[in-house]
A protein has these predicted regions:
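Nucleotide/pyrophosphate-binding catalytic subdomain
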Residues: 1-141
Length: 141
């Protein structure tokens, strides 16, 4: 049995599917820009899973890389500066969410964003609030 068939069989029994996509999977291999073809395929697959009645969570990284590319900043030693990373992340996160919103809308789905940090998990109130937000989003579809 192929890996794809095995994964699909396992997913049939699951209520909630979490998919993690990293920076390198978001970027076009030649240009380093967002790879819209890959993103469209990803979103189409996620919407198909959602249409089968599953809860779907997409965990995405790449905000720093997208932001850096947006302002044409090369990766340098200065990227270690927290302020530089945060500025690139702020730019990139907005661009990522705009892209996801547009693609999900093509499939009549709504995208939402929950930004989480280590503190979201460690702090009881923050964890409670994040959990409630997820629960409400799942209820809303």
């Amino acid at each position: 049995m192929s890996d794809t068939i095995q994964i699909r069989e396992m997913m049939k029994e699951k209520k909630r599917i979490v998919v993690k996509i990293g920076s390198s999977s978001l970027q076009h291999i030649q240009t380093g820009d967002l790879d819209y073809t890959k993103l469209d395929v990803l979103v189409r697959e996620l919407c198909d899973i959602r249409n089968r009645g599953k809860d779907v969570v997409l965990v995405t990284s790449g905000a720093v890389a997208v932001g850096r590319k947006s302002v044409m900043m090369q990766e340098t030693g200065s990227d270690n500066l927290t302020a530089v990373k945060q500025a690139c992340a702020a730019i990139g996160q907005a661009r990522l969410m705009m892209t996801y919103q547009k693609i999900f809308a093509e499939y009549n789905q709504v995208a939402a964003q929950i930004l989480m940090t280590k503190n979201t998990i460690i702090d009881n109130l923050n964890r409670f609030n994040a959990r409630n937000t997820f629960a409400e989003l799942f209820k809303l579809g």
